[in-house]
Swiss-Prot record:
Chain residue numbers at which the record places covalent cross-link Glycyl lysine isopeptide (Lys-Gly) (interchain with G-Cter in SUMO): K230, K249, K254
Taxonomic placement: Eukaryota, Metazoa, Chordata, Craniata, Vertebrata
Sugar-modified residues: T381
GO MF, one example: DNA-binding transcription factor activity
UniProt GO cellular component terms: axon terminus; chromatin; dendrite; mitochondrial membrane; neuronal cell body; nucleoplasm; nucleus
UniProt protein name: ETS domain-containing protein Elk-1
């Protein structure tokens, strides 16, 4: 016997075989009732079939309860060891193969394309929870019917149409991007689409090129006035940093000026420089940003040819002033003694500028005869020596003549030995 046979099929086989009347027998063949004459022997034979030597009737009865829910076998009440096949006529009509009862035959009505004989075998196995395999040589024919029914189902429209329908929706997504991309390509004035992926970045590049083309135009059209030029430079710098940097060539002073802006010194520059006259304010800002456009370079070079040469000398000075407080911190002003002391000592008033002209030619922006107290405060706070030098007192009393007379003597010492300029205990 095949070990894959279910329990109800095993009992039906025992009932049909001759010579098993001493262990199992029909009590009502027409009604499908049978009795386990020797329940323990039946359980032992079932254990041998399943390779379980410890099988007994208790385990066999629990296994039979599984078929109660399946409506295949039920216990006859009031009689011990008596069971009944729920739909025995269908079971008796089968051949050597054990067929499922009536509830399983109703399943065939839902699948008209499959042969009824094959359904008797396959669903019966699914009901029992075990695969249907032939019990012996006589089972080979029904097994072949089961395979043929499966092949018929595979060839039937239920399976093939489902597979074809699942594959049909896939081709449409490919032409859909192709239809959308040609419409986007003329809008962005890009090249003709060579592929769905190659044409997608073209509108973005066109937009970026349009933005790059628009940014230099804004710089060229700016008026040469000092306050407006500074405000427009501040607006253009973040835009240039946000757009493609390769279009804009920025020299060293601009990069360090942006670093100083991050440390909080650019706002002071915007407050102090608009007070400088336009003639000297424009050359002071020109080294900050240098563009590749020929129109801007030619315009400023034609307007101020004599100013373009001193820019090279002013570049380090414009950068060291905002960066010196954060990098040096006051204790070590030896790197820029001239610029630090000059910026802190020239600030008090216009009376000191003629005396310091030969010693401070590298900072012409500070030599304005019309410097105001806000600019004095700006240069005194940015110089590394000013917070500790008596120059801060000159800012607190800009109108006093005694402070202006006292500063030149200290400035001479500051130029030679900058360490002497920090005698006060004031904190930076």
């Amino acid at each position: 016997m095949d070990p894959s046979v279910t329990l109800w099929q095993f009992l039906l086989q025992l009932l049909r075989e001759q010579g098993n009347g001493h262990i199992i027998s029909w009590t009502s063949r027409d009604g499908g009732e049978f009795k386990l004459v020797d329940a323990e022997e039946v359980a032992r034979l079932w254990g041998l079939r399943k390779n379980k030597t410890n099988m007994n009737y208790d385990k066999l009865s629990r296994a039979l309860r599984y078929y109660y829910d399946k409506n295949i076998i039920r216990k006859v009440s009031g009689q011990k060891f008596v069971y009944k096949f729920v739909s025995y006529p269908e079971v008796a009509g089968c051949s050597t193969e054990d067929c499922p009862p009536q509830p399983e035959v109703s399943v065939t009505s839902t699948m008209p394309n499959v042969a009824p004989a094959a359904i008797h075998a396959a669903p019966g196995d699914t009901v029992s929870g075990k695969p249907g395999t032939p019990k012996g040589a006589g089972m080979a024919g029904p097994g072949g019917l089961a395979r043929s029914s499966r092949n018929e189902y595979m060839r039937s429209g239920l399976y093939s149409t489902f597979t074809i329908q699942s594959l049909q929706p896939q081709p449409p997504p490919h032409p859909r991007p192709a239809v959308v991309l040609p419409s986007a390509a003329p809008a962005g004035a890009a090249a003709p689409p060579s592929g769905s992926r190659s044409t997608s970045p073209s509108p973005l590049e066109a937009c970026l090129e349009a933005e790059e083309a628009g940014l230099p135009l804004q710089v060229i059209l700016t008026p040469p006035e000092a306050p407006n030029l500074k405000s427009e430079e501040l607006n253009v710098e973040p835009g240039l940093g946000r757009a493609l940097p390769p279009e804009v060539k920025v020299e060293g002073p601009k990069e360090e000026l942006e670093v100083a802006g991050e440390r909080g010194f650019v706002p002071e520059t915007t407050k102090a420089e608009p007070e400088v006259p336009p003639q000297e304010g424009v050359p002071a800002r020109l080294p900050a940003v240098v563009m590749d456009t020929a129109g801007q370079a030619g315009g400023h070079a034609a307007s101020s040819p004599e100013i373009s040469q001193p820019q090279k000398g002013r570049k380090p000075r414009d950068l060291e002033l905002p960066l010196s407080p954060s990098l040096l911190g006051g204790p070590g002003p030896e790197r820029t003694p001239g610029s630090g002391s000059g910026s802190g000592l020239q600030a008090p008033g216009p009376a000191l500028t003629p005396s310091l002209l030969p010693t401070h030619t590298l900072t012409p922006v500070l030599l304005t005869p019309s410097s105001l107290p806000p600019s004095i405060h700006f240069w005194s706070t940015l110089s590394p020596i000013a917070p500790r030098s008596p120059a801060k007192l000159s800012f607190q009393f800009p109108s006093s003549g005694s402070a202006q007379v006292h500063i030149p003597s200290i400035s001479v010492d500051g130029l030679s030995t900058p360490v002497v300029l920090s005698p006060g205990p004031q904190k930076p």
